[in-house]
């Protein structure tokens, strides 16, 4: 078997694991939005990489002629030591630089980041992902590009699960 055939065979059934960058196209009553599930792990470098990815992706035009928003839904980064608050607050510049238009946040360290955001970028902050979940589900709309990211212990997967349940018919996973 040729090397290209071996490579093709290995990749045919590959799926990005949940929480590790899987993208889903979910549908609201007004149209689809893209969900990027990065809920498994987070550190300052991976947060910045996720924001950079979102910043490079276009938000599609909706049937109503408007464009979606870039939304970040963020949970605490754990095990950062005594500089944790500073490292969380430092994310603000990257959010702005990558054209994130609305930020939802959960956890005590993300409160530091949330309070440092310009008011126009502030969505909602809550103490936990479970408390934040209904606000995110209500806020997403057609054309939006939504990234959910946080350390596994911050349980941001709850928000991914809620979005998938509420907007239950994925158009595609990629």
What label would you give each PLM region?
Residues 1-174:
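ATP-dependent carboxylate-amine ligase
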């Amino acid at each position: 078997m040729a090397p290209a055939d071996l490579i093709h065979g290995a990749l045919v059934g590959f799926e990005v694991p949940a929480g590790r960058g899987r993208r889903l196209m979910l549908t609201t009553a007004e149209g689809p939005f893209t969900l990027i599930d990065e809920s498994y792990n987070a550190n300052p470098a991976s947060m910045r990489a996720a924001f950079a990815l979102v910043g490079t992706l276009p938000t599609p035009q909706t049937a109503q002629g408007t464009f979606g928003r870039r939304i970040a839904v963020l949970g605490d980064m754990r095990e950062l030591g005594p500089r944790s608050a500073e490292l969380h607050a430092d994310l603000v510049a990257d959010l702005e630089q990558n054209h994130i238009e609305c930020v939802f946040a959960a956890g005590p360290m993300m409160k530091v980041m949330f309070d440092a955001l310009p008011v126009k970028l502030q969505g909602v902050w809550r103490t936990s992902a479970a408390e934040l979940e209904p606000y995110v589900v209500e806020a997403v709309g057609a054309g939006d590009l939504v990234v959910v990211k946080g350390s596994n212990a911050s349980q941001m997967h709850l928000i991914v699960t809620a979005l998938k349940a509420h907007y239950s018919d994925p158009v595609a996973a990629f």
